[in-house]
Amino acid sequence: MENGVLKAPAFYISYLLKKNRIEYYDRMSEVRRSGSYEQWIKFFLRVIYESAQDAVETINLLTALHNQSIALIGEPSRVTQTLLTVFHYLETNPIIEIGKTAEALSLSYNAVARAVELLIGKGILAQTDKQGRTRIFSYKAYLVILCKDT
């Protein structure tokens, strides 16, 4: 993150610590009781390793989904720049509203609405909710990958 390669943490140790919280507490108690740090360090290193493995798997799945979605969108020469802009925005904001997306991307409401309809037609985006006149859309396949095991 310091060198600008990552914009956010790529793996989450806290998830695995919570998942294994009984073992976590047992090992911490053992450190307090006997001063045995080695077993704690081995446990923590295992958690880091598993978290890194999970991050690599998630990155691979997201990369494959990106490539699959780009293939569905079509050749860049046959696709509007707005469509690609909205698609790339979806990869950092997988739940959107047309108005807020238009504002965030400095595009017209109608241009974003057309891109959203095209993405729905290609099976990339789906309407998930409607709050009054505001429709909410999500990149469901992306969210499934990000939310696995939660």
Please report, for each region that a protein language model flagged, where it lies by residue.
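Basic amphipathic alpha-helical segments that dock to polyanions
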Residues: 90, 112-122, 137
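Short conserved micro-motifs at the rims of enzyme active sites and ligand-binding pockets
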Residues: 56, 99, 148-150
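Generic recognition of stable, solvent-exposed alpha-helical segments in well-folded globular domains
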Residues: 19, 23, 36-43, 81, ...
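Short acidic, hydrophobic short linear motifs in intrinsically disordered regions
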Residues: 92-105
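Short alpha-helical segments that sit at the start of domains
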Residues: 56-87
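Phosphate/pyrophosphate-binding active-site loops
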Residues: 1-60
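Short, cationic-aromatic polyanion-contact patches
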Residues: 79-80, 127-150
